[in-house]
Amino acid sequence: VNYGNGVSCSKTKCSVNWGIITHQAFRVTSGVASG
């Protein structure tokens, strides 16, 4: 199952896509900085 926020789970394990999370965090941070 892919939750759409960089976390992807199967029946046996969950994996995190840090690239996606870092990108989202950067977008949020830059949005706050500019807004």
From Swiss-Prot:
A GO biological process this protein is involved in?
defense response to bacterium
Q: What about temperature dependence?
A: Thermostable, activity is retained after incubation at 100 degrees Celsius for 15 minutes.
List the keywords (alphabetical): Antibiotic, Antimicrobial, Bacteriocin, Secreted
Tell me the disulfide pairings in this chain.
none
How is this protein's function tied to pH?
Stable from pH 3.0-9.0, inactivated at pH 10.0.
Q: What are the subcellular locations of this protein?
A: Secreted
Question: What Pfam families is this protein classified in?
Answer: Bacteriocin_II (PF01721)
From which domain of life does this come? Bacteria
What's a GO cellular component annotated to this UniProt protein? extracellular region
Q: What else is known?
A: Antimicrobial activity is lost upon treatment with beta-chymotrypsin, proteinase K and papain, but not when treated with lysozyme or lipase.
Similarity comment:
Belongs to the bacteriocin class IIA/YGNGV family.
What does the UniProt function comment say about this protein?
Bacteriocin with antibacterial activity against C.jejuni.
- Put simply, this protein is called Bacteriocin SRCAM 1580
- Originating organism: Niallia circulans (Bacillus circulans)
Lineage of the species this protein comes from: Bacteria, Bacillati, Bacillota, Bacilli, Bacillales
